[in-house]
A protein has these predicted regions:
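Short juxtamembrane and helix-loop transition motifs at transmembrane-helix boundaries
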Residues: 82-87, 107-116, 132-143, 189-196, ...
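Loop-centered beta-sheet repeat module
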Residues: 157-166, 170-215
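Membrane-interfacial entry segments at the cytosolic side of transmembrane helices
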Residues: 169-176, 227-237, 282
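Structural signal for the C-terminal ends of transmembrane alpha-helices
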Residues: 70-80, 164-169, 187-188, 212-224, ...
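Membrane-cytosol interface segments of multi-pass membrane proteins
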Residues: 1-183, 310-344
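Alpha-helical transmembrane segments of multi-pass integral membrane proteins
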Residues: 210, 237-341
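Interfacial loop-to-helix transition and helix-capping segments at the boundaries
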Residues: 48-61, 140-154, 189-212, 244-269, ...
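Aromatic-anchored segments of alpha-helical transmembrane domains
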Residues: 7-14, 110, 130-136, 178-191, ...
């Protein structure tokens, strides 16, 4: 799942910068973006794959949030590991994210300083980025740079929420209430783009897939029994096709249904993983092993390649971007691995 998710994120964050390519509804829902994609689907052009990954690729983030929730349950509830205090838990998970974040952030800001389109930080914004609370600031889309690094702040928020609430009380109802409550909170501000953006930059927007991950982790044994039944491949195919259909439908239907698309993406990704041929699976798994490095590296490579290819030869630029990102991510992982892992 990590391999598929990071591929979508990496391609999305390049393609949505290109001129004439469809734009996504990620933090807010704007009808004109749907209208634009619908026009393209009715009269497809040679850039159709780019349009699709630009519009849908950002949904790799909910997949990672799902995996974060699942991983927390496996680590802190199923492994028999001694319970850590709130401070130790928070420190450990912050440092775990920071060792990935800091390598990419340093390289990116150094490159950004002498290339066109420099982002000038305020001192308070740098501290917020380093402290992983930048998403709380006003207009986070103008503060967080590179843009994909908003993920670190929302992940840290969800880790803290887990330790304060879900780790202490294991009843599934608490998770469901928070998921529904965060959905209703977003519903209330659907017509207020500025507030909705701030909510979706923070844990309110990430609670749905994260909560699904927690529930999946706690019910993993029952889910495994169901998935191992005979004839499940046909069911898996049906689930994948249904998820794809509903993703398209809910994305276009209304802003209310759009809020549920991350859940459909998670279900569809699980089904897709189960259908990947054995010959292809090792490559997808390999992408997953370097996914953290890809996440912090791809904005650096994008800054280099997107401007020369923003209008013409866009597939050539995309190919160069992908090749360079994979190679540099492999090297970046080696640098990250040299930083000691925090101890719980």
């Amino acid at each position: 799942m990590k391999g598929i998710a990071i591929l979508g994120i990496m391609l999305h964050n390049y393609c949505h910068w290109l001129k004439g390519i469809a734009r996504e509804n990620e933090y807010t829902w704007l009808q004109w973006k749907n209208d634009r994609l619908w026009e393209i689907l009715q009269q497809p052009d040679e850039w159709l794959p780019m349009h699709l990954v630009s519009y849908f690729g950002h949904y790799g983030v909910p997949v990672f949030l799902f995996l974060s929730g699942f991983g927390l349950v496996m680590k802190y509830e199923r492994s028999g590991q001694p319970e850590a205090s709130f401070w130790r838990f928070t420190r450990y998970n912050y440092l775990k994210l920071f060792r990935i974040f800091i390598v990419g952030f340093v390289f990116f800001t150094m490159l950004d300083a002498f290339t066109p389109g420099i982002h000038r930080y305020l001192a308070s914004e740098v501290l917020a980025m380093l402290g992983m609370y930048a998403n709380f600031l006003e207009h986070p889309s103008e503060v967080v740079w590179p843009g994909p690094y908003w993920y670190f702040s929302v992940t840290m928020q969800l880790y803290i929420l887990y330790r304060l609430l879900f780790h202490r009380w294991h009843h599934w109802g608490i998770v469901v209430v928070l998921m529904v409550g965060c959905w209703l909170w977003q519903m209330f501000y659907l017509d207020d783009s500025e507030t909705l953006e701030r909510l979706r930059y923070n844990l309110v927007g990430g609670m749905l897939p994260f909560g699904m991950g927690i529930l999946a982790g706690r019910w993993s044994e029952r889910l495994e029994v169901f998935c191992e039944r005979d004839g499940q491949q046909w069911v898996t195919c049906f689930v994948l096709l249904l998820s794809m259909f509903l993703t398209f439908l809910f994305s276009f239907l209304s802003s209310q249904t759009w809020l549920w698309v991350p859940a459909l993406i998670v279900v569809g990704t699980i089904a897709l993983v189960k259908l990947i041929p054995s010959q292809v699976m090792p490559y997808v798994v390999w992408l997953g092993t370097i996914s953290a490095a890809i996440f912090v590296t791809h904005p650096i490579v994008r800054k280099i390649f997107v401007r020369p290819y923003i209008h013409e030869d866009m597939y050539a630029g995309l190919l160069l971007y992908v090749v360079a990102t994979l190679l540099l991510s492999w090297l970046m992982k080696k640098i990250i691995d040299q930083i000691p892992n925090p101890k719980l």
